[in-house]
């Protein structure tokens, strides 16, 4: 092996290691903010209605953000630059939270943070796919570190909440975001990729295809169903007597189940249609929410509901990525992903957060809130059940 080839191999290995670290920190941050933001806001004295409204405002930023950043990355070809800029602006906007003492001040800070935060993952995925292809590596071995980071931070912050104030999630997030920003500064720039004007012009024709529209409607309904879980699950467990450590372990259990299903997802996708799998995932998600609301005091039910995260999120995510990859032309993957994130997670997530916040009533209507989520998940499944055989063209 020549000296130049040896250096290239070493640089490639270093970049893959940095990508592992970046995934660990990115999803580690999600492991702090997603489960424990409600705890932080409750500690600040906000009502369940206000918590739901703030979650909705934050989530709305995901409607505009992904498409904006995807367009900038597509047109400039500077994927890494967009990723790094997103991380820097995320840290700056998140830091303002420490000086905010009002509802709208926090809403502005969190909303700006989420707007910049949406620049990170889509670009990270592009860089990773290009890097593993050139290095002959495997995407799964890199992405696995994201799940590890989520588990580590979720459990650690859960334990810390047993001993410290409800501001712990904010301090942990600030440290994690800063470390993430630093890690991205050492990543390598991928090759510039540009789509032609003709390719860009075909995009809206592609996304108006009935199969894509059905996919977006169902995905949006499913994300509406997650509103109660994302906004109030940790508060629900606290009210049921679970400690912070136990809550962290239960959330981590869901991520472990998610990792396991990722291992078998491709075999399932090869055997069954995407529509059929997503319909089954919708039914199981409805069962998860209804059981959690009706029998949340049972340890077995709570553990079982977390294991169903393998289908609610894991298989659903794998099937959704598979659909976008196979239904859309390669030069539309980034923007297709942006549409999916923006509408399903942005509009759907915000709607679910707001409605569940209005229903929750400091936990008095927990059953009603989870029942609402179960109905939304069933509607998601129904959309696919109706159209799966007639109009679904992807496996």
What is each of the regions a protein language model found here?
Residues 81-95, 276-291:
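Structural signature of the two symmetry-related core transmembrane helices
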Residues 65-78, 161-162, 261-273, 360-361:
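Helix-to-loop junctions at the C-terminal end of transmembrane segments
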Residues 3-13, 187-219:
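Juxtamembrane intracellular "pre-TM" segments in multi-pass secondary transporters
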Residues 24, 93, 103-121, 220, ...:
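Hydrophobic core of transmembrane alpha-helices in multi-pass small-molecule transporters
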Residues 111-145:
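Cytoplasmic helix-loop-helix junction between adjacent transmembrane helices
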Residues 159-175, 357-377:
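A membrane-interface helix-boundary motif in multi-pass transporters
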Residues 97-98, 179-191, 371-395:
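Multi-pass alpha-helical transporter architecture, strongest
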Residues 9-59, 212-219, 223-240, 244-250:
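Helix-loop boundary and gating motifs at the non-cytosolic
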């Amino acid at each position: 092996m020549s000296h130049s080839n040896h250096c290239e191999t070493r640089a490639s290995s270093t970049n893959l290691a940095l990508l592992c670290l970046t995934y660990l920190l990115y999803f580690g941050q999600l492991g702090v903010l997603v489960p424990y933001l409600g705890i932080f806001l409750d500690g600040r004295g906000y009502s369940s209605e206000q918590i739901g409204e703030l979650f909705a405002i934050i989530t709305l930023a995901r409607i505009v953000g992904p498409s904006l950043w995807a367009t900038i990355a597509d047109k400039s070809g500077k994927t890494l630059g967009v990723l790094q800029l997103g991380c820097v602006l995320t840290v700056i906007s998140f830091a303002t939270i420490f000086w905010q003492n009002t509802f709208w001040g926090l809403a502005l800070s969190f909303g700006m943070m989420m707007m910049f935060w949406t620049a990170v993952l889509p670009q990270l995925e592009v860089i990773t796919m290009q890097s593993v292809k050139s290095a002959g590596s495997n995407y799964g071995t890199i992405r696995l570190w994201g799940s590890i980071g989520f588990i580590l931070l979720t459990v650690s912050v859960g334990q810390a909440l047993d001993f410290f104030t409800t501001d712990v999630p904010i301090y942990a997030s600030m440290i994690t975001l800063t470390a993430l920003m630093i890690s991205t500064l050492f990543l390598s720039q991928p090759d510039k990729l540009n789509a032609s004007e003709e390719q860009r012009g075909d995009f809206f024709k592609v996304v108006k295809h009935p199969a894509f529209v059905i996919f977006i409607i169902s995905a949006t309904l499913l994300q509406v169903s997650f509103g109660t879980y994302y906004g109030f699950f940790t508060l629900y467990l606290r009210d049921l007597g679970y400690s912070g450590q136990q809550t962290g372990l239960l959330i981590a259990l869901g991520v472990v189940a998610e990792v396991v299903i990722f291992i078998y997802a491709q075999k399932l996708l090869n055997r069954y249609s995407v529509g059929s799998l997503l319909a089954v995932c919708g039914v199981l998600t409805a069962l998860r929410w209804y059981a959690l609301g009706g029998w949340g005091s049972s340890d077995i039910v709570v553990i079982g509901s977390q294991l169903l995260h393998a289908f609610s999120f894991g298989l659903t995510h794998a099937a959704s990525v598979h659909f976008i990859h196979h239904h859309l032309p390669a030069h539309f993957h980034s923007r297709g992903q942006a549409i999916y994130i923006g509408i399903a997670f942005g509009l759907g997530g915000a709607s679910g957060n707001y409605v569940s916040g209005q229903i929750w009533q400091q936990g008095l209507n927990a059953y009603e809130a989870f029942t609402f989520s179960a109905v939304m998940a069933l509607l998601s499944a129904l959309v696919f059940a109706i159209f799966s055989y007639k109009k679904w063209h992807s496996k």
